């Protein structure tokens, strides 16, 4: 089913025919597509299928739909945290229509702001790394902070998938409110590292994560980014080890383990300052036959939602 409203295309993806139906095993994909009805919205999900500016000529525009389908492989119950997502009210906003067009970023940003006006937390599904920009710009960049999990600093010049951080700095984001987690040796140039330091970014390299642990690094990153306002968290899955994220063309051996990524996702969802999250740089057309990267991205959605369910009461 497909319908369109105000530049957003909404898709209700049916459960894959190969999956059995069991009323006692509710699927997370059904939970998301059911919507909130008349209830206040807890979690909104918006697809931003950017791909045209990618240096890798990737098929990232196929990924939002792939993540939605992958959610059908999981249930709504998180046993270790005693959380059932049926207690949260979701809203699948749909996909921004052709976000790579000249007016695409404007329409994506408008869709983000519409969702934020109704939901406690928004997750956008990219798309290449350029999808980070309109998602973060849904917040007031004069006050907002950013936590970026990425194998590199997106500080290249030009309007590309690897220039999101540069674009946000140009739009008014201050480096002192930016935290970066997971940068790897041999993936960051000396020039970019010097700029990140000069701008006052809080940096937690892959080595720091290994030494301190992902939970401690995320706690420090979120605290630094959230010092004066709401926070956007960007999950560029190229931060992961290539063995678990083969659909991320920049992923390297030695990156984050899947469990570390999911711990970070839960921390983002649980932090009261976090208002927006994105998942980017997954090319569903380049995934392994078992769709491990797409399924990992779907688990990021669920872990963020679990964190939201366990946020401290205001």
Regions found by a protein language model. Give the residues of each.
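Conserved alpha-helical scaffold segments that buttress catalytic/binding sites
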Residues: 3-314
């Amino acid at each position: 089913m497909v319908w369109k409203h105000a530049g957003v295309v909404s898709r209700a993806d049916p459960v894959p025919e190969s999956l059995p139906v069991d009323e006692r095993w509710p699927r997370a994909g059904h939970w998301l597509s059911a919507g909130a009805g008349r209830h206040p919205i807890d979690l909104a999900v918006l697809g931003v299928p950017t791909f045209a500016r990618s240096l890798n000529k990737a098929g990232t525009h196929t990924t939002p739909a792939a993540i939605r389908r992958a959610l059908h492989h999981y249930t709504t119950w998180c046993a270790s945290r005693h959380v059932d997502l049926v207690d949260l009210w979701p809203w699948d906003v749909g996909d921004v229509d052709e976000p790579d067009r000249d007016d695409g970023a404007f329409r994506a940003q408008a869709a983000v702001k519409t969702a934020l006006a109704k939901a406690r937390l928004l997750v956008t599904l990219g798309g290449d790394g350029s999808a980070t920009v309109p998602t973060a710009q849904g917040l007031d960049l004069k006050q907002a902070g950013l936590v970026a999990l990425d194998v590199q600093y997106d500080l290249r010049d030009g309007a590309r998938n690897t220039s999101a951080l540069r674009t946000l700095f140009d739009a008014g984001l201050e480096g002192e409110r930016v935290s970066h987690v997971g940068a790897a040796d041999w993936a960051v140039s000396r020039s970019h590292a010097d700029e990140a330091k000069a701008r006052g970014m809080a940096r937690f390299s892959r080595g720091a994560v290994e030494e301190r642990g992902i939970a401690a690094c995320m706690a420090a990153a979120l605290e630094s980014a959230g010092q004066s306002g709401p926070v956007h968290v960007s999950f560029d899955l190229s931060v992961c080890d290539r063995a678990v994220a083969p659909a991320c063309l920049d992923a390297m051996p030695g990156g984050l383990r899947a469990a570390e990524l999911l711990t970070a996702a839960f921390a983002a969802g649980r932090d009261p300052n976090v208002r927006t999250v994105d998942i980017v740089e997954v090319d569903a057309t380049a995934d392994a036959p078992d769709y491990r990267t797409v399924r990992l991205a779907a688990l990021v959605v669920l872990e963020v939602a679990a964190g939201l369910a366990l946020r401290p009461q205001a």
